[in-house]
Regions:
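A generic local secondary-structure boundary/capping motif
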Residues: 16, 46-49, 126, 138-144, ...
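Internal alpha/beta scaffold segment
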Residues: 67, 74-100, 175-261, 319-325, ...
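Dual-mode signal for accessory low-complexity, basic/Gly-rich regions
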Residues: 268, 276-495
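Acidic low-complexity segments
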Residues: 1-5, 10-12, 17, 25-37, ...
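N-terminal alpha-helical targeting/anchoring segments
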Residues: 34-92
């Protein structure tokens, strides 16, 4: 699959030579992507698809700070060189066109080749075989839990990039992303609830991997049982209360609240910035809490290099309670008052890169133990963890928010609204089950109220993140569970 990217040495060198002769910085982004999908419902394939795309985008910035970007859906040499000439011409007319000027950054040349280890395994996927396997998995799930409708899905994607810069940089990397997912919906009349589960891997054969399938079935069974039980649950009372959230909801808090507000291209309106500059050193949380974003190899959102051809760096957004790094690219770091963390990502070669997250987590110093795997913890086991740590001596009743079902944050104010999958009131007397409710409030109040963490870091809460018309993979998490003390700015909805 990556043969076209492998043969770009001469063309990349010529583009760099011409850009240098014209006195511009040029970034040439070449991409090939293969995506295979299967969706199964009621024992048959509802849809299958196989999509491949390839092409390139050229971005230039001249000495005056005017830039332009253009793209083509092929990798042919003559059209690529002609496109370069046109982009250079547009940038040269930047003042007349009213383009915004940017500072021409000084970048460190990069040279690294990390192509896909087995690209043929992606383009040779047998969709008929994948469909048969998904039908088997759907049947297994339906056999374990009755009373729900089940939809199962498979996606295998290989996203390969080669990025040249006119300073001689040449980086080539491939990002394999494969998932099997399911959604269970309560059947019958009245209120209906849907609950999802997903497992990811870098191999397109994950539906035949014993460990992946076992985890998938365990998560799918739990999701199906929850979907079946939710219609009969009562609504949770509204108000502020102490909370326990799991790693998936913690990822949502880190990503939606602090992550987006830390993206340097948003500092003009971010609650974490003043007059366009990140408020480095300002206290926003307790000393034992940090928020970190970095690429994790093998992860769903792994990206080792930015879309500008720079090695992506670990960014500590909140370092033991204080603002530290922003998520920046060469054009936003200096103006935003943060160091360059090479956080730029692009959905495709057509798009202009933007500072984005990869794998983001909330990390707490000295977490308490939570033995075993996360999937072994139901509400009763979470209650036992809290009891063993003496949390009930501080809070006689705690609301456990299980799972994450999306949400949004206003990065200008820090106000958030999140959705969980279910709520359980935990107390020394037992467990009470409720429908999910809105979890809302101030991101500062939520972070300040984090008191304890249980278990190791778990970073496999995956999804896709949209920003300015671009969608890129995201992932992250936290420790198995976080305990949040009651805070007046954080509340649960309900009736």
């Amino acid at each position: 699959m990556s043969s076209d990217l492998a043969g770009l040495d001469s063309l990349g060198a010529e583009i760099s030579r011409r850009a240098a002769a014209a006195g511009v910085l040029a970034i040439w982004r070449c991409q090939e992507r293969s995506v295979r999908r299967v969706l199964v419902r009621n024992g048959r394939a509802e849809s299958t698809s196989a999509v491949s795309l390839g092409g390139h985008g050229i971005q230039v910035v001249n000495a005056e700070g005017y830039g332009a970007l253009a793209s083509r859906d092929d990798l042919r040499a003559e059209p690529a060189l002609a496109l370069l000439d046109r982009v250079i011409d547009v940038a040269a007319r930047g003042r007349t066109l009213g383009l915004e000027r940017v500072a021409l950054p000084e970048l460190r040349p990069e040279h690294s080749h990390l192509p896909a280890a087995d690209p043929d395994s992606f383009v040779s996927i047998d969709l008929a075989q994948a469909t048969r396997r998904l039908i088997e998995l759907e049947s297994e799930i339906r056999g374990r839990v009755s009373g729900v409708t089940v939809q199962v899905s498979y996606r295998a994607e290989l996203d390969s990039w080669r990025i040249f810069r006119s300073d001689g940089s040449d980086v080539w990397f491939a990002m394999p992303r494969c998932t099997i997912g399911m959604r269970a919906t309560s059947a019958g009349y009245g209120s209906r609830h849907g609950v999802s589960a997903v497992v990811f891997d870098s191999s397109p054969r994950l539906f035949d991997d014993e460990a992946s399938v076992a985890l998938y079935l365990k998560r799918s069974e739990a999701a199906s049982r929850l979907a079946r039980e939710l219609p009969d649950a009562a609504p949770h009372p509204s108000g502020s209360s102490p909370l326990v959230i799991d790693y998936a909801l913690a990822k949502g808090l880190a990503h939606e609240a602090f992550g987006h507000a830390s993206e340097a291209d948003s500092f003009r309106s971010s609650v974490l910035a003043s007059e366009g500059r990140f408020r480095v050193g300002e206290e926003v949380g307790p000393e034992h809490v940090s928020i970190i974003d970095e690429p994790v190899e093998g992860d769903h959102a792994w990206q080792p290099f930015s879309a500008n051809g720079l090695a992506r760096e670990r960014a500590v957004l909140v370092d033991h309670g204080k603002l530290s790094d922003g998520l920046s690219d060469p054009w936003s770091a200096v103006s935003g008052g943060v160091r360059l963390t090479a956080a730029a990502r692009a959905e495709s070669f057509h798009h202009a890169p933007q500072p984005r997250m990869t794998n983001i987590r909330i990390e707490v110093d000295d977490p308490l133990p939570a033995p075993g795997e996360f999937e072994g913890y139901g509400p009763e086991q979470v209650r036992d963890l809290l009891a063993g740590a003496g949390v009930f001596r501080r809070h006689p009743k705690i609301a456990y928010l299980s799972g994450y079902s999306g949400g949004q944050v206003n990065p200008a104010t820090g106000d958030f609204v999140f959705h969980c999958k279910a709520i359980y009131d935990l107390s020394p007397d037992g467990v009470e089950f409720f429908k999910p409710a809105i979890f809302s409030g101030s991101m500062f109040g939520a972070l300040q109220s984090i008191r304890e963490a249980f278990g190791p870091l778990k970073l496999d809460a995956v999804g896709y993140c949209g920003k300015w018309g671009q969608s890129v993979p995201s992932s992250g998490g936290s420790h198995y569970f976080l305990v949040l003390d009651e805070h007046p700015t954080v509340r649960l909805g309900g009736r």
